[in-house]
């Protein structure tokens, strides 16, 4: 016997969260809980404003229609990426095919003061990997901050993300302030420039490796080995079903590229599932999941060690 519930939720964000020049005051999304017999599976559907093509209102309509079809015996996945991902996670939990083992080691995220990151990294055991958002301020300042971090922590490897913010000139201004002796410790810089060709040129001219992120979701993207390209960053909420995520990881690994499972600012429930997906598909790579502290609460499932208060399922708005 099948049954299902759908919940709508909204989490207040910290004041300083800006996405694509828009301040994100709340994180809005949906949960689906599928039950069959004694088993149940959960999934999160939370399109990311400014990045997802769909809104959460679009996703809600598609999800409710899919759930009604599933209750009637139809299992075909929806095409909308955020719904396909959340539904496929719920189905995988239901079928017990999503392993429980999780990689909760997140690369800490630096959004502002580099001193905060230095203190956080001092207590980090093992491999020291951190992520820094660049492109929000002047490129020269970004270069100086990155250089400072690499100089202060000799065993640090940085992942940088520019979200296509730079012109070729700004990319050169950034690189000018990063000591060439430190550049090999930049694990990769995600999408430095507005076009892929400009990003490729940046990698050639600066000897700083790059990674594809937004490019993966463009219709003309193909997985090929390219000089200067070291990694792909896979955001499942923006990608689609678990199977599609798995295919992209497999394609990247076949080319010798690092595949990083990365957050789209999901709630704690979604983040714990991403940690499980990372342990399963990319066991040797620290995922990019350090986004929970941007929110003011956890929901339904806790992220280990987080002091944020937990909102129980009973407090959520039930739609079905």
UniProtKB/Swiss-Prot annotation:
The active site is at 133 (proton donor), 235 (proton acceptor). Belongs to the mandelate racemase/muconate lactonizing enzyme family. MenC type 1 subfamily. NCBIfam families: menC_gam_Gplu (TIGR01927), PRK05105.1 (NF003473). Its cofactor is a divalent metal cation. It comes from the Bacteria. Keywords: Lyase, Magnesium, Menaquinone biosynthesis, Metal-binding. The keyword Metal-binding applies. One of its GO terms (biological process) is menaquinone biosynthetic process. GO terms for molecular function: magnesium ion binding; O-succinylbenzoate synthase activity. Pathway: Quinol/quinone metabolism; 1,4-dihydroxy-2-naphthoate biosynthesis; 1,4-dihydroxy-2-naphthoate from chorismate: step 4/7; Quinol/quinone metabolism; menaquinone biosynthesis. Converts 2-succinyl-6-hydroxy-2,4-cyclohexadiene-1-carboxylate (SHCHC) to 2-succinylbenzoate (OSB). It catalyses: (1R,6R)-6-hydroxy-2-succinyl-cyclohexa-2,4-diene-1-carboxylate = 2-succinylbenzoate + H2O. This is o-succinylbenzoate synthase. Its EC number is 4.2.1.113. Mg(2+) binds at residues 161, 190, 213. PANTHER family: O-SUCCINYLBENZOATE SYNTHASE (PTHR48073:SF2), O-SUCCINYLBENZOATE SYNTHASE-RELATED (PTHR48073).
